[in-house]
């Protein structure tokens, strides 16, 4: 980055926060390193905390090798979750608050214990999970629509908080099991040309395996920023099904089998 690193990071973070607030998060094409991108994300976190937003957890993104290839990275990324972007099942949201709304159906966990850098075995991670929750993650999809065609967009993705725009959570279930999981995602868009529901069915061990893999990766990665996952935090663990761009108005429903369901409306 040109100029004073501190000035450049702060100025860039201010601009990206303004883009987030105005729902104009798009792919800018700026050339940052991964380290610079995470520095910008940390400054964004400081700014959001200063205006009263509370950190409630983290998200892991780019868990799929396909998405990693599209954005030009060979590992996942992480973003932060804030109390201002958490809603409960059944909520109706204004689609205008998202820059090209897109959704993912996935599993999240709520932690009942802190995790340190050595706490990455399956058994330790499972003991730290208080509950498993089906969620609908909301994204600024306009960014990804361009990023996945240009490639090498990972640093901009990281700096923009992994284009996370909030999440809707279901009730979930206590604990965690590695038993084969299920996610059925349906989107109903009354004004879409087809006007037929879109469905994605994902069934298999990878649905639950990604939870532990993502949590282990996050626990190690956060050490670089002197952070760690803490009891009480929510961790979005990455989606096995692909991200779905949606048109508004629409109804989104995710069925996670024994773990319950979650639904929302975008108006």
Regions found by a protein language model. Name each.
Residues 228, 252-253:
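Hydrophobic, well-ordered secondary-structure scaffolds
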Residues 2-210, 245-247, 251, 259-267:
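Catalytic-core "active-site belt" of small-molecule-metabolizing enzymes
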